[in-house]
């Protein structure tokens, strides 16, 4: 039974029990009896004056096999004083902090229970059999398992001496004597029972060249090597390997070949089996460094998958009798190591893959979100997990069935009582969604413990949220480990000695990036999925919801949360609604993109688990596939100093870090701006990389070739040919690989050039690659098999059901991703298996293909008759004007062909035939060109920057931001209007084309084409609106993100920092880090100049202040001197020089302040900014000369003068009006003459 949201009444007239409306009676002396809660709704939150001494929670006895909390009678009590609703306002800041002796409590629907008590009824759903050593299996529970689905794989080491009580069969004891690695498959049965299958007998191993080992170590038999290895471990620092013996190793002699170079031949190697991954890692890094190790970094899970053909990391398995008809052994509940319903011991021969089953069992998805609040003196500061006073106040959890996508439960954990708004409850009911269960708690520890207990007892297999990896999980885990000293190793699927950890893996745009590893819980952060799949100007959850879901959340600013939280249960319910709706939106995003399907498809293909697929990058995917194939072909892969090791190895602990949401902690970063708003061209120049290989050889290679664009505006059709899967097809066509490469001419001297091998010069060095009939490329085999698999999957989609089609589409997309990773895999100098010669050859061949295509097109179809000879249908697609065909741009795998004298519709129909013709004439299969699109109009600006309209009228934009998040709305709208006019108004298009055909300098001495009048009219109207006194200032608001503390900026001359300090000086609320700061640029007035002087002094005070949070001074400092040493233009005459012209960044102002005070905008700045944005886009019309472009665009705007406000007032008093747009030069001259007389 679950209680739903509602009032405090309880059934049967029982007094309602609620949290955060009071606590207990006043503090009793130590040892006295605690009084019961009053039988009414509590309105005060008692400060227990809890004793600062006391014992930690009871340690678990040696017989207990779990480290999660199953009992607790004392804990650290931290709760906000703002919950003391009857206390005076001055006593409702800060937190209560002490220790409390009682069991943790939870309140729901007027009822009260112990958090850790497990009974027949509970406040949240549970899926568990064992808790705290007690068996809660329902009556009639059948533990039989035949078929089960695996979603996660764990590995750990067991020792025979510690497992004697587990009643293992003899064959399993042999596998762990003296120690052995155990693989645990976690999954679900078709009936919904959670299962853990422990597979014994998997051994990790590595290779060493036998001749080198025998020479260096004087080994005469494999046992001698085992003795040397054991001795090396015993001599290692620390006590970890002190008792290790030669029995921990087995060695055998095998024949293998190094995968590098064609001339390498099979030779004898020692294959050394090691019973511990830690011992293996130490040996590969430290044992006899002069001897190269092979495949020592491969973890036990990968060995288990690759050494058992057909095994998968995500899919259905069947238990069967093994060798000698030996069955799998059910584990007794007393020996369970996980929170599963059933556990089995087996060996690999007890398992068979059920390939025909492709549906998913009833896995559970938890979508969660947390709300936090600072609890110190400044409740608007950004919360930091390491501070005891900064609290998690609410957690929303939405629980879905992953197979049906049904939302089954909504939970809201609340610190303090919470009444969700009736409107929210009605909305959920009207949408057919379950009523929320509100769980209330007296302290943060109780709430967090309840949340983790729920996670343990419910055990969702998949977890999602928005930026949970960078904020929510780190904050919660840091609170539990640092503040409350709670061990987390038992809160995943493992009951103890598991992993539940988050750590940093780097930083991007000042936003930390993290990994999470939880046994039996796959975390898929939708923030990462969205940033990868969708291109948006902002990745805040609200912006994503509007763009992707066409939905919008009810917004609540972080700075409003403290006031709402302190205002009672009803207002806390508003926060709760906000928290729940965030999780609802993320759930919708999850089921729109279905990331688990694509990730699981990649995991199956690559032979790695889903967590590694998410966090370990592209290289690991190709490496495992190559490792599998190399083993089948008799090759071994050299070690690269442990770079293959996975998440299970130790990683440094990490504190919680601020997530990237500006308005509150929680919505993802998404708005990383450059500090300076500049539009630099991406010149796309090739850069040469020089890499050093292990043997001291050097290889340099250029990036992909880009044919310089013929910039301009093209109104004749432009056909774009695209190389299909360019780099994979080059590898296949030319048989490129580690194993087919040779650097020595003598190695291929017995072969025939061109027929048996390819000779190519790369970076000034000759390379040789043998053809497939001599030795087939491993990379080529992988690509061929993958692409054949993808083709077969795609062919099944049209005949599939909608559900099957989605799954198949995700599978083919996963294969495409892995195929495209192969080139990059070879080209990373410090990668898992680098071969820069292969990467350099791929790009060299790609450049040659572009050049060959250009030469062929220019020669083959230079005349229309030549085109007609190849394509007779071209006779019907002739257009007025002279004929020509030339390539105007080539970009890595695309070629732009300008076709004059031909119709666009005809080229669309004939494009594929042209592409096929070029492919047959120039390239080896499977390399082929495809006709990707045909532009009817194309503005080609620079490399990787163009705007065009394809047949059908759709506009395509690449590399050009028409709508930039750090431009104001007015400039974005005007820029878009100009582009639409250029492409969709034929008169303007024709005039622009004529403009682009002539040198830009010519137009400086002659009028612009008349057809551009409409274009100019938009600029004139924009100028009029900018100078209109009735303009809407909101249209001119710019924004920039406060990416870090103002003191951390190297460049202090930034507009948004100016506004930050102005707000600080005015004692207004300053923005938090990651907030986007709005601002406008105002005119330079006396008030602005004085403010700038004061700000300079305030910046100096803030820079010298300790701590991270600035505090406004008690009184504004007086400026040391004015920003000018002479009178301003508004002062009476007599000054000798003009005032200093302020920087644009100094003219930034808070929009609200500007509106309230009537501060005038800097119209010259905004128009210059508009011209600058237009110049970036339209400079291609003027030979990419930005200076000439701006000069010519200004022609549309008559010269005007914008006096300062006080000067303008004196002119108005004298009867003058503005000389706006449209005034003639003579009228302007006469008015200015009279004005000079007036002002003199």
UniProtKB/Swiss-Prot annotation:
User: Organism, per UniProt?
Assistant: Human herpesvirus 2 (strain HG52)
**What's the EC number here?**
2.7.7.7, 3.1.26.4
Q: InterPro entries annotated for this entry? A: DNA-dir_DNA_pol_B (IPR006172), DNA-dir_DNA_pol_B_CS (IPR017964), DNA-dir_DNA_pol_B_exonuc (IPR006133), DNA-dir_DNA_pol_B_multi_dom (IPR006134), DNA/RNA_pol_sf (IPR043502), DNA_pol_B_thumb (IPR042087), DNA_pol_palm_dom_sf (IPR023211), DNA_pol_type-B (IPR050240)
Q: Which SUPFAM superfamilies match?
A: DNA/RNA polymerases (SSF56672), Ribonuclease H-like (SSF53098)
Q: Assembly and interactions?
A: Forms a complex with the ssDNA-binding protein UL29, the DNA polymerase processivity factor, and the alkaline exonuclease. Interacts with the putative helicase-primase complex subunit UL8; this interaction may coordinate leading and lagging strand DNA synthesis at the replication fork.
Q: Which PANTHER family match?
A: DNA POLYMERASE CATALYTIC SUBUNIT (PTHR10322), DNA POLYMERASE DELTA CATALYTIC SUBUNIT (PTHR10322:SF23)
Recorded protein name is DNA polymerase catalytic subunit
Source taxonomy: Viruses, Duplodnaviria, Heunggongvirae, Peploviricota, Herviviricetes
Bias type Low complexity, positions: 1-22
Skewed-composition ranges (Acidic residues): 669-688
Record's superkingdom?
A: Viruses
């Amino acid at each position: 039974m679950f209680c739903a949201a509602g009032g405090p009444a309880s059934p049967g007239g029982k007094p309602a029990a609620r949290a955060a409306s009071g606590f207990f009676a006043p503090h009793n002396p130590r040892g006295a009896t605690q009084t019961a809660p009053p039988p009414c709704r509590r309105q005060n939150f008692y400060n227990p004056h809890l004793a600062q001494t006391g014992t930690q929670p009871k340690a678990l006895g040696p017989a207990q096999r779990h480290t999660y909390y199953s009992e607790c009678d004392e804990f650290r009590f931290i709760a906000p004083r703002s919950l003391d609703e009857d206390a005076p306002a001055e006593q409702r800041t800060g937190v209560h902090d002490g220790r409390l002796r009682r069991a943790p409590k939870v309140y729901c629907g007027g009822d009260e229970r112990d958090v850790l008590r497990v009974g027949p009824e509970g406040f949240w759903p549970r899926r568990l059999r064992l808790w705290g050593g007690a068996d809660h299996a329902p009556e009639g529970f059948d533990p039989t398992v035949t078929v089960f689905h695996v979603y996660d794989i764990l590995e750990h080491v067991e020792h025979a001496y510690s497992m004697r009580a587990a009643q293992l069969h003899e064959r399993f004891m042999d596998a762990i004597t003296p120690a052995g690695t155990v693989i645990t498959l976690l999954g679900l049965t078709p009936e919904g029972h959670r299962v853990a299958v422990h597979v014994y007998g998997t051994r990790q191993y590595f290779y060493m060249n036998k001749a080198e080992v025998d020479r260096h170590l004087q080994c005469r038999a494999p046992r001698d090597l085992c003795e040397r290895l054991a001795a090396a471990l015993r001599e290692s620092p620390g006590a970890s390997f002190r008792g290790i013996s030669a029995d921990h190793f087995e060695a055998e002699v095998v024949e293998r070949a190094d995968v590098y170079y064609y001339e390498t031949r099979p030779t004898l190697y020692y294959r050394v089996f090691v019973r511990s991954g830690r011992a293996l890692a130490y040996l590969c890094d430290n044992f006899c460094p002069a001897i190269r190790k092979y495949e020592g970094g491969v973890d036990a899970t990968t060995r288990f998958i690759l050494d058992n053909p057909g095994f998968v990391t995500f899919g259905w398995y069947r238990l069967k009798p093994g060798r000698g008809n030996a069955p799998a052994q059910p584990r007794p509940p007393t020996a369970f190591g996980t929170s599963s319903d059933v556990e089995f011991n087996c060996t690999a021969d007890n398992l068979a893959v059920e390939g025909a089953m492709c549906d998913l069992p009833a896995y559970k998805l938890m979508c969660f979100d947390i709300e936090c609040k600072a609890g110190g003196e400044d409740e608007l500061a950004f919360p930091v997990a390491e501070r005891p006073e900064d609290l998690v106040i609410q957690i929303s959890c939405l629980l879905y069935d992953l197979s049906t996508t049904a939302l089954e439960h909504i939970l809201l954990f609340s610190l303090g009582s919470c009444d969700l708004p009736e409107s929210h409850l009605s909305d959920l009911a009207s949408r057919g969604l379950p009523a929320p269960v509100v769980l209330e708690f007296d302290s943060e520890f109780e709430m967090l413990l309840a949340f983790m207990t729920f996670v343990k007892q419910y055990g969702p297999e998949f977890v999602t949220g928005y930026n949970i990896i960078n904020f929510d999980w780190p904050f919660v885990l840091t609170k539990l480990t640092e503040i409350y000293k709670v061990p987390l190793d038992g809160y995943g699927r493992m009951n103890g000695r598991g992993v539940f950890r988050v750590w940093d893996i780097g930083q991007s745009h000042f936003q930390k990036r993290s990994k999470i590893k939880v046994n039996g819980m796959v975390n898929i952060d939708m923030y990462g999925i969205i940033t990868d799949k969708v291109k948006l100007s902002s990745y805040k959850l609200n912006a994503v919801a509007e763009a992707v879901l066409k939905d919008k959340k009810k917004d609540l600013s972080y700075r409003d949360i403290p006031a709402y939280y302190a205002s009672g249960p009803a207002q806390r319910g508003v926060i709760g609604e906000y928290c729940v709706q965030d999780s609802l939106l993320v759930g919708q995003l999850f089921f729109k993109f279905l990331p688990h399907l694509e990730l699981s498809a990649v995991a199956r293909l690559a032979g790695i688990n889903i967590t590694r697929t998410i966090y370990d990058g592209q290289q690991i995917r190709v490496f495992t596939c190559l490792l599998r194939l190399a083993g089948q072909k008799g090759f071994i892969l050299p070690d690269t100093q442990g770079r293959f090791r996975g998440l299970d190895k130790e990683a440094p602990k990490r504190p919680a870090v601020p997530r990237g949401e500006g308005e509150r902690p929680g919505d993802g970063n998404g708005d990383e701006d450059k500090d300076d708003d500049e539009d630099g061209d991406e010149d796309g120049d090739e850069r040469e990389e020089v890499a050093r290989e292990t043997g001291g050889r050097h290889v340099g290679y250029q990036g992909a070739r880009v044919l310089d664009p013929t910039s301009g505006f093209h109104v004749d059709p432009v056909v774009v040919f695209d190389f299909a899967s360019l780099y994979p097809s080059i590898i296949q066509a030319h048989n490129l690989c580690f194993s087919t490469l040779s650097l020595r001419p003598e190695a291929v001297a017995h072969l025939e050039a061109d027929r048996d091998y390819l000779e190519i010069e790369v970076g000034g060095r000759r390379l040789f690659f043998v053809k497939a009939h001599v030795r087939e490329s491993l990379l080529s085999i992988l690509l061929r098999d993958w692409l054949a698999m993808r083709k077969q999957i795609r062919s099944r989609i049209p005949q599939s059901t909608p559900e099957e089609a989605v799954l198949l589409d995700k599978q083919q997309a996963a294969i495409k991703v892995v195929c495209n990773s192969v080139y990059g895999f070879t080209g990373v100098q410090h990668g898992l298996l680098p071969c820069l010669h292969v990467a350099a050859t791929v790009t060299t061949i790609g450049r040659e293909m572009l050049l060959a295509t250009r030469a062929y097109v220019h020669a083959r179809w230079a005349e229309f008759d030549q085109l007609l000879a190849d394509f007779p249908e071209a006779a019907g697609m002739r257009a007025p004007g002279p004929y020509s065909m030339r390539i105007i741009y080539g970009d890595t795998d695309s070629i732009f062909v300008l076709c004059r004298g031909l119709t666009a519709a005809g080229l669309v129909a004939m494009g594929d035939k042209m592409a096929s013709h070029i492919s047959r004439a120039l390239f080896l299969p499977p390399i082929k060109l495809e006709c990707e699109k045909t532009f009817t109009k194309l503005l080609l600006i620079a490399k990787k920057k163009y705007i065009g309209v394809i047949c059908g009228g759709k506009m395509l934009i690449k590399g050009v931001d028409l709508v930039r998040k750090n431009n104001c709305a007015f400039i974005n709208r005007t820029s878009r209007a100009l582009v639409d006019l250029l492409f969709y108004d034929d008169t303007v298009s024709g005039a622009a084309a004529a403009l682009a055909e002539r040198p830009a300098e010519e137009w400086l001495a002659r009028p612009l084409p008349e057809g551009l009048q409409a274009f100019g009219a938009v600029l004139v109207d924009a100028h009029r609106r900018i100078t209109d006194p009735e303009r809407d200032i909101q249209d001119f608001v710019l924004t920039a993100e406060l990416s870090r503390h103002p003191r951390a900026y190297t460049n202090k001359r930034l507009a948004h920092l100016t506004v930050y300090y102005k707000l600080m000086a005015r004692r207004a609320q300053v923005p938090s880090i990651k907030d986007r700061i709005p601002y406008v640029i105002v005119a330079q007035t006396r008030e602005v100049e004085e403010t700038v002087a004061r700000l300079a002094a305030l910046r100096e005070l803030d820079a010298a202040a300790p701590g991270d949070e600035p505090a406004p001074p008690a009184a504004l400092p007086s400026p040391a001197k004015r920003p000018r040493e002479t009178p301003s233009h508004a002062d009476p005459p007599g000054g000798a020089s003009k005032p200093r012209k302020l920087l644009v960044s100094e003219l930034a102002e808070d929009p609200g302040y500007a509106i309230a005070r009537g501060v005038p905008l800097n119209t010259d700045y905004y128009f210059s900014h508009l011209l600058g944005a237009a110049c970036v886009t339209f400079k291609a019309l003027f030979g990419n000369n930005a200076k000439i472009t701006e000069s010519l665009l200004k022609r549309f705007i008559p010269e005007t003068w914008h006096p300062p406000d006080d000067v303008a007032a004196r002119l108005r008093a004298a009867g003058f009006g503005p000389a706006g747009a449209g005034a003639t030069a003579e009228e302007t001259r006469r008015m200015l003459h009279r004005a000079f007389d007036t002002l003199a």
